Amino acid sequence: MAADQRPKADTLALRQRLISSSCRLFFPEDPVKIVRAQGQYMYDEQGAEYIDCISNVAHVGHCHPLVVQAAHEQNQVLNTNSRYLHDNIVDYAQRLSETLPEQLCVFYFLNSGSEANDLALRLARHYTGHQDVVVLDHAYHGHLSSLIDISPYKFRNLDGQKEWVHVAPLPDTYRGPYREDHPNPAMAYANEVKRVVSSAQEKGRKIAAFFAESLPSVGGQIIPPAGYFSQVAEHIRKAGGVFVADEIQVGFGRVGKHFWAFQLQGKDFVPDIVTMGKSIGNGHPVACVAATQPVARAFEATGVEYFNTFGGSPVSCAVGLAVLNVLEKEQLQDHATSVGSFLMQLLGQQKIKHPIVGDVRGVGLFIGVDLIKDEATRTPATEEAAYLVSRLKENYVLLSTDGPGRNILKFKPPMCFSLDNARQVVAKLDAILTDMEEKVRSCETLRLQP
């Protein structure tokens, strides 16, 4: 332990005294004190190494040397706001444009996903002249007041649903109303959006936007059925609204097959607005909104300047460019496909072996493991999931849960997560699940004894 480093207990005591308890820690019963990270590994104050399965912010790996170097070199020369001409912002916008459909060709740079989604909401309202938003159940789009209002995950615990917010069912084919045995779940779930829109219109409401993560994360690592977004976009645009794809958790090659998760819905589907954050800067605060020309021009026509003090700074754009360079140089998109497929295969074997594993779903390095109490009802195994995550931490694997029932193990590791990491993590998962089952059998045996 470094000589100038506080003991863990002192750090915890200071945090409890100085930092609001609403700013929560992972593993609150026994928090991990992380002092260093590299690649897909994190290290505590004692030097113990943890495999990081959840830091999708450290997209190309914690403290990637090329990203660190890019930030350092630019910071030594200039860092200022975007009101001055500078090559970095236009170079970065051009590189991003090469990854997107040509219609998405106007860019705004910001500092966080919340800022990006807030701006997307403003753009949608200016373009359409409408107010209302359709969102998916249990969605989360950010911590600003405007975004809490369109995040059922949050607003149900606060002031409740605003009259201008309309909630459609998650397109969850495992535990939603239209499941894997439905002949056309994409159409069925899209028709639910159509029904929500019609209900709003009957009340005199006008739809500005449909907001959705391209792969709902907080909702439980959901993979929407192919064709769902195209049909939703048709219903929304017919009502005069636009489609906003939130790529903050899932963009930049994480899904492997495509650079953007919305592209899983087919080459003909193009959102009107795309928001980016988290992984875009590999830990540096960067975010972006990409919009079509008509949407951007309507915003410009208001005559109101959009200015963000740090958004699009030379350092932020240098970092963003470095992340794109690493993704390309290290072929991390292909890596996500191969390692993600292998991890899905290993987790699928756990589903066969352990009844608690109800479903394994995912694409690339975005994977969810749905833990259940019984197969017939698919009741979320919430307590078991929490216990499992705690045991994995004791075995130096950092994982967390999500979903309405907090029973979905979510895998969103840095993109350098390896085949060997997959083997290690699943081996530890298997051992803990086996131990849990043996303890249950032991308790049942004791109950059966006279």
Swiss-Prot record:
Transmembrane segments: none annotated. GO terms for cellular component: mitochondrial matrix. It is linked to Phosphohydroxylysinuria: A condition characterized by elevated phosphohydroxylysine in the urine. There is no clinical phenotype associated with this finding other than the urinary metabolites. The modification N6-(pyridoxal phosphate)lysine is found at residue 278. CDD domains: OAT_like (cd00610). Homotetramer. Gene3D superfamilies: Aspartate Aminotransferase, domain 1, Type I PLP-dependent aspartate aminotransferase-like (Major domain). It catalyses: (5R)-5-phosphooxy-L-lysine + H2O = (S)-2-amino-6-oxohexanoate + NH4(+) + phosphate. This is 5-phosphohydroxy-L-lysine phospho-lyase. It holds the Pfam family Aminotran_3. InterPro entries: Aminotrans_3, Aminotrans_3_PPA_site, PyrdxlP-dep_Trfase, PyrdxlP-dep_Trfase_major, PyrdxlP-dep_Trfase_small. It is an enzyme of class 4 (lyase). GO terms for molecular function: identical protein binding; lyase activity; pyridoxal phosphate binding; transaminase activity. Belongs to the class-III pyridoxal-phosphate-dependent aminotransferase family. The lineage of its organism: Eukaryota, Metazoa, Chordata, Craniata, Vertebrata. It comes from Homo sapiens. Its EC number is 4.2.3.134. Its cofactor is pyridoxal 5'-phosphate. Catalyzes the pyridoxal-phosphate-dependent breakdown of 5-phosphohydroxy-L-lysine, converting it to ammonia, inorganic phosphate and 2-aminoadipate semialdehyde. It is found in: Mitochondrion. Keywords: Disease variant, Lyase, Mitochondrion, Pyridoxal phosphate.
